[in-house]
Structures are given as C-alpha cells and as structure tokens.
Amino acid sequence: MHVISLSLSSIFFFLFLTSTILISPVQPTTSKPPAPRPHRELSADYYSKKCPQLETLVGSVTSQRFKEVPISAPATIRLFFHDCFVEGCDGSILIETKKGSKKLAEREAYENKELREEGFDSIIKAKALVESHCPSLVSCSDILAIAARDFIHLAGGPYYQVKKGRWDGKRSTAKNVPPNIPRSNSTVDQLIKLFASKGLTVEELVVLSGSHTIGFAHCKNFLGRLYDYKGTKRPDPSLDQRLLKELRMSCPFSGGSSGVVLPLDATTPFVFDNGYFTGLGTNMGLLGSDQALFLDPRTKPIALEMARDKQKFLKAFGDAMDKMGSIGVKRGKRHGEIRTDCRVFL
C-alpha cells in the first residue's frame, strides 16, 4: 500500500468515529501455482552451523524498524504473502525490473503497486546486515520469512519457529501475479479456490485473513461498497450504516482520496489480535472480501470462533503461517540461488 499521505489527525478522526471496527480490486485463479512441499525440506536449525546468529541479526533490524517505522510490520507481512502466492516463497517479489527491460518483475504488477516501500526496505536492511556476518549463505526468502514472523510477534501476535532452507527463485514475472493474488472484492468461492490451489484449507483461508488486524486499505479498494455496490448505484447493504456515513466522509465519490488509507481493524490497528474478526461480527469489515467471510456458511463459523477465542486464533495463525511458508519452496542450484542483493538475480 503506497500510503500514508493520510494525516495523523485524519486517522484519529476516523478511529474516534468508529468505536468498533495485506488488497487490490476479481479475477478467479486460472493457473496452478505450486502447492506446499513437505516440511522435511525445511528445518528450524538449517543455519545452526553456517550462520547461528541469523535470527538475532534479523531481529535487531525488525525491532528497530518496528519502533521507528511501525507501518513496516503490516507492509512486510503482506510482502511475504504476495511472495508465497505467486512463485512460491522464493523472494521473487523482491526483484527489481532491469532498466529498459520490457519484462516487468512481480513488484511492477498492478496488484503489487500498493506494496509499501517500508516492507522492501526492511528486508534490504536485514539482508545487508546478514551479508556482513554470513556472506552468500542466507537466502532473501528465508530472511523475508523470519522478518514477517518477527513483525507479527512484535505487534502482539504469536511467536512460531520459522523453518528455513529456502533458495531464492530465478524468475520474477509481473504477468504471473493477477491470477494468484486475492482481490478486495473477491467472492468466497474465488478465495476458497485460490487458497486450495496453494494447498491451504478453508480454515487457513479465514485464519490468514486475520492478518488484516494490522492492515490498511486505500479508498479505491472499497469505494464501490460505499456508492455503487455491484452496479446498483446503492451502497453494500451488509455495511453498517454508521460506518458507511463515516467512510463516505473520508472517501468521497470522486477526488481527494487517492492517498487516503484506513485501517482494516480500527479498534487496534497496530496490535495483532482478533479485533478484525470481532469487527466482521458487527458488519464493520472494510473490504467486501473480508465481510464476505462472515456471510458465507462455510467461513462464518470459523470467523466466529476466531472472534470468540483470541488465543485459539493466535495459535492457528502461527500454524497457518508455517504451512504457507512452505509453498513452492526452491532447493538447489537447478531451481534456485542464494542472492547477495535481494533486488537482482545472480
């Protein structure tokens, strides 16, 4: 999300008005990206001899970034999700398009235009520090996985062991992004199909959506819900009327809101908790794809359970992140590489 041209005063104004309350506009998935490979290919102690201080090094960067640039947390978590869902968890999202090249890298895709620089910067800084201690040994994809976990934990979420041993991918193509990233108006059918193509269950779909507890969205991603829901020229009937009025104040129908972002969980936007799910229970979901989880009989019971039991959600989220982190893992020189600069192939 390329944001916060939103002022602090307008954030607090929005939070004051809404006592209750990772995103792009739908397109079903057609490709068949790699499903998770067995965890035997990854291990928590993969670098125990090669770079035993790895997690301490990455942690020193993430803790500093969290204090100085808190938006780095949701930005990096979203970056990890977008990486894993396209080519697998291989750091391909970090590649920059070569100057003058017509072959655009993943990060140039429309669906990735709102990925914030704070997320990329966090990984670049962590990689530079790791390289100074363990040159050419640690993949960018492993650093991204560790950093995402760190930010989740720093924000109040679960601490889980990150299995490591990923190699960085050798390709990054913008055209592969659209069918593999959920949209802000995706239907539950589309979401279930997409997540299933990655080897993830309906429960894991709902649980991983809980990362929106510290997420933000641009007005354009939910403007249709406010003014012209599915071409009716009316707002989404599932939207709480108080919230509708407040959102229209922040996001006018035309002009003046291109840089405005609003929290997906306005009660605790920088705390990783189950507030996202309690918001859905009172029709305070900002995105149509979020609120849909509370309207569909396949997903509503899971969302209700997560809203009722914070600890159960946190445990389930850590487990789901662990599983997601094994999607499309690359191993060995035939399939991958260990980049020294996360932005360019070797």
From Swiss-Prot:
GO molecular function per UniProt: heme binding; lactoperoxidase activity; metal ion binding
SUPFAM superfamilies, per the entry: Heme-dependent peroxidases
Primary location group: secreted
Keywords (A to Z) from UniProt: Calcium, Disulfide bond, Glycoprotein, Heme, Hydrogen peroxide, Iron, Metal-binding, Oxidoreductase, Peroxidase, Secreted, Signal
Catalytic activity: 2 a phenolic donor + H2O2 = 2 a phenolic radical donor + 2 H2O
GO cellular-component term (any): extracellular region
PROSITE patterns the record matches: PEROXIDASE_1, PEROXIDASE_2, PEROXIDASE_4
Binding residues annotated for Ca(2+) 2, in chain numbering: 213, 265, 268, 273
Binding-site residues for heme b, renumbered to this chain: 212
Covalent S-S links between cysteines: 51-134, 84-89, 140-342, 219-251
Cofactor: heme b; Ca(2+)
Residues engaged in binding substrate: 182
Signal peptide feature range: 1-31
Site note Transition state stabilizer, residues: 78
Note on cofactor: Binds 1 heme b (iron(II)-protoporphyrin IX) group per subunit. Binds 2 calcium ions per subunit.
Known EC number: 1.11.1.7
Cited InterPro entries: Haem_peroxidase, Haem_peroxidase_sf, Peroxidase_pln, Peroxidases_AS, Peroxidases_heam-ligand_BS, Secretory_peroxidase
Name by which UniProt lists this protein: Peroxidase 19
Family to which the UniProt record says this protein belongs: Belongs to the peroxidase family. Classical plant (class III) peroxidase subfamily.
Enzyme class, broadest EC rank: oxidoreductase
Purpose: Removal of H(2)O(2), oxidation of toxic reductants, biosynthesis and degradation of lignin, suberization, auxin catabolism, response to environmental stresses such as wounding, pathogen attack and oxidative stress. These functions might be dependent on each isozyme/isoform in each plant tissue.
Binding site for Ca(2+) 1: 83, 86, 88, 90, 92
Something else known: There are 73 peroxidase genes in A.thaliana.
One Pfam family it belongs to: peroxidase
Residues bearing glycans: 185
